[in-house]
Amino acid sequence: MPKTNLSPAITYLAIPPSGQGPGVLVVHAWWGLNDFFRGLCDRLAGEGFVAAAPDLYEGRVATTPEEAKRLRGLPKREPTNQTLLRAIVELRANPAVVGPNIGVIGFSMGGHWALWLAQQPGLPLGATVTYYGARAGDYGNSQAPCLGHFAETDEWVSPASLKKLRKSLEAAGRVADFHTYPGTGHWFAETDRTDVYDSQAAELAWSRTVAFLRRQLRPPEL
C-alpha cells in the first residue's frame, strides 16, 4: 500500500449501538455518496455492523445518468482503486471492528468495484455482495463467498456478462449465491430511484444480505 498525504479514505462511518461489530465497506453507485448510501450504512449499523463508505466523487453527487457519467469521468486526487484499498485498511484498523475479515457491498458501479476487490490477493475480505454489478476475471485469489442481487430486465448488465461472472467464480471454486428478482430493473434496491425502486424486491435482497453478512462475518461470541 503506497503512502499518501491524502485525507482519510472513509468519509462516512456508522457504529452499531453496541459500539463494536464486524466491518462492512459500502461502495456507492455512480450517483456518488448520497443520502441513500449513508442511510444504508446506518441500517447496517442497526444490524450490528460497523459500516464505512468512501466518497469516490469527493463530495459531488448526481441525480441523473447524464450527471453521473460526467462525475465518473472527472479527474480525482487518486485512482479509485487506491481509495478503496486505503478504505479497507482504515476500516480494518478501526477499534470498533471485530473479527479477522470485513465484508464489502457495492451497488452497480460499486458492485463492479466490490468484485474487483474480491479478485485482489491479500485483502481481509470475508464476504462480497454485489447489487446489479458484474465483473468477470480471475477469482483464484479470493477467499470471500459472493452474494449477488440482479434485476430481471437490466439494460446495464447483460445476460452474457452475468454468465461470464458465474463462470469466473466457478472456475476459481468460489462459493456464489445469485438471485434474480422478477419484474425489476437496474437500481431496484435504491429508494431514491423512484422510477425503478421495488420495495418488495429491495427488502428481500436486504434480508438476504444481512443474513449472509452475519453468517460470513459475525464471530460466534457476538
Model-derived regions, located:
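N-terminal cap/leader regions of alpha/beta-hydrolase-fold enzymes
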Residues: 1-222
